[in-house]
Amino acid sequence: MAEREQRGGRDQRGGGRERKEREERDSEFVDKLVHINRVAKVVKGGKRFGFAALVVIGDQKGRAGFGHGKAREVPEAIRKATESAKRNLTRVSLREGRTLHHDIAGRHGAGRVYLRAAPAGTGIIAGGPMRAVFETLGVQDVVAKSIGSSNPYNMVRATFDALKHQDSPRSVAARRNIKVSTLQSRRIGGDAEAAAD
């Protein structure tokens, strides 16, 4: 008993409350394995094979991130990629909690993506790696198109590049020193004029 008191009241399992908090924090995230690739390192005795994993995680409430991990075994590569993604989270503002505020484009290397806001009920119209990003982010309605490189790494990075360039009405209003209601009334007035033409 004296030994247990010296260690701060923790038993042999350790962790206690800290471990429980960490597990709760981890359980709020949804993770998707986007791509797994076999890689080789050439050493003096020949080739040493391993695996590289690309993982996207998010809380489905506007936070998402991606990570890359390499290891000799697949589960370890996925674990490393997930840890990397948790350190690399990005917050994205969503309109009505379901779609983007406006159309945006992003690029990385030879990969380009175009993302369009969509009305309710459209669903996620996107392929492969982009779909995983939107599902973990919590986007329910979006139309996405990729042009150029279909490399999953480039597509995920290009998608996050596009999402970083999105502006919410609140941030635009703050930049222009006007109220959000003024900005939205101008937008509605502009839409009515365009429809009349």
From Swiss-Prot:
Task: Specify the S5 DRBM domain's residue ranges.
Answer: 29-92
GO cellular component term, pick one: cytosolic small ribosomal subunit
> What PROSITE patterns does this protein map onto?
RIBOSOMAL_S5, S5_DSRBD
- The reply on keyword rRNA-binding is yes
Q: Extract the GO molecular function terms from the UniProt entry.
A: rRNA binding; structural constituent of ribosome
**Alphabetical list of NCBIfam families matching this protein:** rpsE_bact (TIGR01021)
| Assembly | Part of the 30S ribosomal subunit. Contacts proteins S4 and S8.
What's its job? With S4 and S12 plays an important role in translational accuracy. Located at the back of the 30S subunit body where it stabilizes the conformation of the head with respect to the body.
Question: What is recorded about the protein's domains?
Answer: The N-terminal domain interacts with the head of the 30S subunit; the C-terminal domain interacts with the body and contacts protein S4. The interaction surface between S4 and S5 is involved in control of translational fidelity.
User: What protein is this chain from?
Assistant: Small ribosomal subunit protein uS5
Protein species of origin: Bradyrhizobium diazoefficiens (strain JCM 10833 / BCRC 13528 / IAM 13628 / NBRC 14792 / USDA 110)
